[in-house]
Design a protein with these regions (language model features):
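Short acidic, hydrophobic short linear motifs in intrinsically disordered regions
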Residues: 66-77
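Short amphipathic alpha-helical interaction segments
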Residues: 77-93
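A short, conserved structural fragment
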Residues: 92-103, 321-322, 354-355
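Glycine-centered, phosphate/nucleic-acid-interacting loop/turn motifs that mediate DNA/RNA or nucleotide
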Residues: 95, 254, 310, 319, ...
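Short, amphipathic alpha-helical interaction segments positioned at domain boundaries
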Residues: 105-144
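Ferredoxin-like iron-sulfur electron-transfer modules
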Residues: 108, 258-264, 268, 286-315, ...
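Catalytic cores of enzyme domains
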Residues: 144-298
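Flanking helices and flexible, charged tails adjoining ferredoxin-like Fe-S electron-transfer domains
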Residues: 336-435
Length: 435
């Protein structure tokens, strides 16, 4: 039988000789070739079982890491291009892969678990999967077990996400020092497609009876990712004006903007609460080990004006502010090692006793998603998976982008890259680039 179970005379994709467990194991191994992986566990197996049929697990496990065309999938699966297209279209309709249009037609890419297909599954109400069961499994995997969250947020120096400061609280001095890519409004202005979806985090918590009352339809995606999700009904298309109105709504609800940790080509901005969203929960759970990259700002309290009302303490989404007593005096203290620099506390101080200052340390942001992926892969010892993808012929453009990112690395990272790849070709490239 083929992908959807219909018998055909022509060559089709069969699964009778492989057990379901092996299929999901192969899929798990494929997922973990990418820096943003998912540590094995019985819970992960159950999650994959909800999201993928056995046939889908087998097929997706064979797909390359880099973007690919339908002819690549057809060759891997040994089927016709029309059959491969039908399968890929079905996978895209479930947001298990993304379909992206360019000047050569349609290409496909398998997103990582997060930010990726884990979230997509809960970004709209669905009846084709058991979302309550899935939410319970997610809660077990991310909130009870620790391996996934530690791997996602703490296994690399380079972070997957970064925080955007609340622009409405910036002073004139702040406005001078903030860069365009540090502004959520700039990301919105530069986007060609904008999609709005249900907040995966709060939707998940809703199914386990732990959701807060923060806005639900406020998750933002951009450009090719947004267009794919819109076309497959996982997001609704909005214009820049409406997106900025939603951003303002997020500010008013003390939500923290967490987006992709890149300067160009940001694909998502989540509006995170402190009770439901993984990054904020992790920030509270693991102390000063930042799960996402901070902003370049840090709040500073003017203690002469502060009335110690505690509104900033209540508003802080990661419990980085507290009331302390020293030498018989009580005052408000910000834990700067924990603080993300989001600006929520500034917004909630009606006495104007808190203002944002520039951090002393320089915040380094990867240029784009390829640069970030290369850095994360080097730090996890997985760079070879990005370069040598045995499941398909490498795309020259993707290879060129990866090598270009490597050539721009600092010397220490270049050495790590060279050691991991053990490539004479890469060594030659690096030596030529350093001259």
């Amino acid at each position: 039988f083929d992908f959807i179970g219909k018998q055909k005379k022509k060559k089709v994709i069969t699964i009778s000789h492989i057990t379901a467990k092996n299929m999901y194991k192969s899929l798990e191994e494929r997922i973990n070739k990418f820096p943003q992986g998912a540590p094995p566990s019985d819970t992960l197996y159950k999650i994959l079982n909800v999201l993928y049929t056995e046939q889908e697990a087998k097929l997706v496990a064979q797909l390359p890491i880099k973007p690919f065309r339908v002819k690549t999938a057809a060759k891997i699966w040994s089927v016709s291009e029309s059959e491969a297209y039908r399968v890929l279209d079905k996978l895209a309709s479930k947001a298990l892969i993304l379909d992206i249009e360019d000047n050569k037609g349609k290409k496909y890419i398998m997103p990582p678990p997060m930010a990726g297909f884990f979230e997509f599954a809960m970004m709209r109400t669905r009846h084709d999967i058991d979302q309550k069961l899935l939410a319970e499994l997610y809660y077990q995997y991310m909130n009870v077990e620790e391996d996934f969250i530690k791997d996602l947020f703490y296994s690399t120096e380079t972070k997957l996400g970064r925080v955007y400061v609340q622009e409405e609280v910036l002073t004139n001095d702040n406005e001078v020092s903030i860069l365009d890519y540090e502004r959520a409004t700039h990301i919105i202005d530069e986007s060609t497609h904008i999609g709005i979806s249900m907040c995966y985090c709060r939707h998940r918590m809703q199914h386990v009876g732990k959701a807060c009352d923060a806005p639900m339809d406020i998750c933002m995606t951009f450009d090719n990712v947004a267009n794919s999700l819109i076309n497959n009904k996982f997001a609704r298309r909005v214009d820049k004006i409406e997106c900025k109105e939603l951003l303002h709504q997020a500010y008013e609800h003390n939500l923290v903007q967490c987006g992709e940790n890149v300067r160009k080509g940001v694909t998502f901005i989540c509006n995170c609460c402190g009770c439901c969203c993984e990054a904020m929960v992790a920030a509270k759970r693991f102390g000063n080990l930042h799960p996402v990259q901070t902003t370049s700002f840090i709040p500073n309290i003017n203690h002469e004006n502060c009335v110690k009302c505690g509104k900033c303490i209540t508003a802080c989404p990661i419990d980085a502010i507290s009331k302390v007593k020293e030498d018989g005096k009580e005052y408000i203290k910000i834990d700067e090692d924990r603080c993300l620099g989001c600006g929520v506390c500034v917004r909630n101080c009606h006495k104007n006793s808190i203002m944002l200052l520039k951090r002393d340390e320089k915040i380094i942001t990867p240029a784009n998603s390829v640069h970030r992926a290369v850095l994360m892969a080097i730090e996890k010892g997985q760079l070879q998976n990005l370069i040598f993808d045995n499941n398909a012929l490498a795309s020259h453009r993707a290879m060129g982008a990866i090598l270009s990112a490597i050539l721009k690395l600092e010397p220490a990272k270049k050495i790590l890259a060279s050691k991991q790849l053990k490539s004479v070709y890469l060594d030659k490239l690096l030596s030529m680039n350093d001259k």
